[in-house]
């Protein structure tokens, strides 16, 4: 298993290279998932935990007071200030031409500011080319795509043949598709792919919620191939102190990563 540093030097995607460099520099494989509906609160929490994360995962369409100038521009400033990247968890799932417009147009203009986004494989490989075209037409900055191979929710249909087919779609573009949302390693190294595995549903304290979320521990997911742990309510839910929890998850994630090499 290659180190983050080695992967930052060898990866085919500039987005992945930068992400691995940040992870190595900050000693963090923590992605903060902030499902927060008010801009001020979103930015405030992000500013406090920014030093401890490599990535923030947003759901920009739940921000009720969203404006491009008031939400996106300060978000980008915080990413610059604290040296983390931005992942908009849009989960595109339509035909190529439609997702192309969803990605670059509308009120959110995701392709302009999100380093990384993600998509379901359900509509086939056209989704990858549609999103890539949108990125190329929108910005000169590099963009990366994650495919949703597996989900952490109870009763998810994303497993088995569906997961295998999604992996095949990912192989259609080595530079733009940088990895997967998945629960374990997706292989591919023998064919020259170096996929980043990001795993949601990671918690040190909770086992799940009433809406079907199932949590796994940091050690458990990193041991099975996760590169980046995605933590949401574990950082700020139930009256938790975001700074204290961000430090805790950063340390747990980094220690689990170092244990890979023992």
UniProtKB/Swiss-Prot annotation:
Pathway: Pyrimidine metabolism; UMP biosynthesis via de novo pathway; UMP from orotate: step 2/2. Keywords: Decarboxylase, Lyase, Pyrimidine biosynthesis. It comes from the Eukaryota. One of its GO terms (cellular component) is cytosol. GO terms for molecular function: orotidine-5'-phosphate decarboxylase activity. The keyword Nucleotide-binding does not apply. It catalyses: orotidine 5'-phosphate + H(+) = UMP + CO2. The active site is at residue 91. Its EC number is 4.1.1.23. One of its GO terms (biological process) is 'de novo' pyrimidine nucleobase biosynthetic process. InterPro entries: Aldolase_TIM (IPR013785), OMPdecase (IPR014732), OMPdecase_AS (IPR018089), OMPdeCOase_dom (IPR001754), RibuloseP-bd_barrel (IPR011060). Substrate binds at residues 35, 57-59, 89-98, 215, 233. Belongs to the OMP decarboxylase family. This is Orotidine 5'-phosphate decarboxylase. It comes from Pichia kudriavzevii (Yeast).
